[in-house]
UniProtKB/Swiss-Prot annotation:
Its EC number is 1.1.1.-. This is Short-chain dehydrogenase/reductase OXR1. InterPro entries: NAD(P)-bd_dom_sf, SDR_fam. Belongs to the short-chain dehydrogenases/reductases (SDR) family. The gene is OXR1.
């Protein structure tokens, strides 16, 4: 049996039974993990951000096992990235020369630009970009650019990175004849922001970065909604191309046992996380199946949300196109204040 390069995504027809509370929904997800996709990445060059641990690491292992010609690990620490590379080689038997490690710190715009420059030095092509790196904070923290840190990492710097990657993704698709993939790891949590949530001046971005109203739980959901507006913006932009060459989609692996909440420290937090993960979390390997699948979906997944092995409906606010377009414009303008080239890229792409 030949192994396909792409898989066809079914429309939503499953997932957790409707009306479940969050604990029961998470428990359902734990007992119904994603299926392992049957797909090949032979001939493809793949980038994974946040690749030295958790979901990103397990996704990189799968790309190596599924035949990707080259895997690029984007990591905050080169030392940890090299350790991850060694483990991938040990687990898959791949040649170490097939894997590159590059530094990327999404807390700083300058690091994003340095990373993209380095990327062009190690590969002339890029077929898959899995933007997995993310941050969850127990306390409010500002980036050097003045934004709440999760907003900076998960949304603004990720938007800059995606914009700078698009030209290479497009040219690679034109050369190979197969569409490239730009996949953002997001979360079902974006659906948990209620329709009547009080937005500051009607702005998701201002609400997400406002220190006076910030709390770890609701702000996580708001940031995921903000990120979904970015995904939809990139999808609209790419759909407007004369020849659409890049499939843009998003994916939720559901709750997985990773170190995303690494800053939640202390004895009580550690014990609580251990129990919580035992009861409700998928393993990182199980979650990575979903990520891999999203980057192998066909054009029907463009602008869509992959979750529980289905094209899942967006949350109510993410279906509000006027709000999503307004938020996308705010994201681009926010990045453009410090990195004006993104405004030019928006005009020329």
């Amino acid at each position: 049996m030949s192994v396909p390069s792409f898989i066809t995504a079914p429309e939503f027809e499953g997932g957790p039974p409707q009306g479940l509370s969050i604990p029961f929904r998470l428990r359902w997800s734990k007992t119904h993990p994603p299926k392992e996709p049957i797909v090949t990445f032979k001939g493809r060059t793949v980038l994974v951000t946040g690749a030295n641990t958790g979901l990103g690491f397990e996704a990189a292992v799968k790309y190596a096992a599924f035949g990707a010609d080259k895997i690029i690990l984007a990591v905050r620490s080169i030392e940890k990235g090299e350790e991850a590379k060694k483990r991938i080689v040990e687990r898959t038997g791949r040649d170490a020369t097939d894997i590159s490690v590059l530094k990327l710190d999404l807390g700083e715009y300058s690091s994003v630009k340095d990373f993209v420059s380095a990327l062009h030095e190690v590969t002339p092509t890029l077929d898959v970009a899995l933007l997995n790196a993310g941050l969850g904070n127990p306390t409010y923290e500002k980036s050097s650019a003045g934004w709440e840190m999760a907003v900076q990492v998960n949304v603004l710097s990720t938007a800059l990175l995606a914009m700078l990657l698009l030209p290479l993704l497009r040219s690679s698709a034109a050369a190979s004849g197969a569409k490239s993939h730009l996949t953002f790891v997001n979360s079902f949590a974006h659906t948990l922001v209620p329709r009547d949530f009080p937005l500051i001046e009607g702005s998701i971005l201002k609400t997400a970065t406002d220190e006076s109203s910030w709390n770890a739980s609701s702000s996580y959901n708001i940031v995921k909604l903000l990120a979904m507006a970015s995904v939809q913006g990139f999808a609209r932009m790419e759909a407007g191309e004369d020849q659409q060459r890049v499939i843009v989609n998003s994916v939720c692996p559901d709750l997985c046992e990773t170190d995303l909440g690494r800053k939640f420290t202390g004895f009580i937090s550690s014990i609580g996380k251990a129990i919580f993960y035992y009861l409700f979390a998928l393993s990182a390997e199980e979650g990575a199946r979903c990520l891999i699948g999203a980057t192998a979906l066909g054009p029907e997944s463009h602008g869509r949300f992959w979750h529980h092995d289905f094209l899942y409906p967006f949350g109510e606010l993410a279906q509000d196109q006027a709000l999503m377009k307004k938020t996308w414009n705010e994201i681009i303008e926010a990045v453009g204040r410090d990195e004006p080239e993104i405004l030019q890229l928006c005009r020329t792409t």
